Amino acid sequence: MEILLQVIWTPPSVAKPKTGKYYHSALGVVDYISGIEAAFRKYIGENSVDELKSAITKKPMILIAGDQLTGKSTQAKSLAEHFGGAFRSVGMLFREAAANRGITVAEQARLLLTERGIDVDIDYKTCQMIAGNELQSNLAVIEGRQPAYMGSFMASLGKKHIVRLYFQCSIREQALRFLRRESGEAAYQVGKSQIPNKKYGNLEDLRTEIQILDIGGEAIDKFMENQNRDEDDRHRYSGLYGFDYGNLDGYDIIMDTNNKEPVEVFEEVLKELESFGFRAD
């Protein structure tokens, strides 16, 4: 059955980004919209922004970001299927970039510390996806760390019909899900029942609790490496453009996935999208 998408909203927060500015310790108040534009013109080409403008379509975009292991990829795929749209992952762009260079993903991740152009190229391709010109389906769901902020940039160029979601859950919940993925269901269930359900001030406190239980020792080390890498990425984007993609002011809908199964989260997401004004008939 063909799905007809009826767009009935133009969110003010998207059409006119809330401020376009965030505080960066080294630079003071930074206009991240201008920061993105300057980076594109420098690394992609002087006409790159004009080319993005000309590629803009009316196709709706659901842009999803969030903490690790919050279920954002699962929900993005489910939404794309539900609305008959395309699923796109920024992580896929990163892997393709590494393959084109003939290097591993880990090697490319290390290059990010010194080569700003890698980030900018991936972000520009993300903006091209948001523009929708090369999209065959009626909408797209784009998942990654920065698509919502790239969506705000595209909104400044005239792109409409964007909704930006952020998925979050506690560090404890993220660690438990990582244990389930890396060490299996048994380790997950032990951790869930015995790791105190409280707000942890830092990763080391959580690591200590897990090490006491003697479950998934190597897995939790990998989890902490991933968490530290995420912090590095946030600092890098702050320095490059002037925004922190963990700043919730850049989103329209915040989803808390703590202690929730994917089906429950999906139902909540659909309700939030409906309340926001997104509807498919």
Positions of PLM-derived features:
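Hydrophobic anchor at the beta1->P-loop junction of P-loop NTPases
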Residues: 64
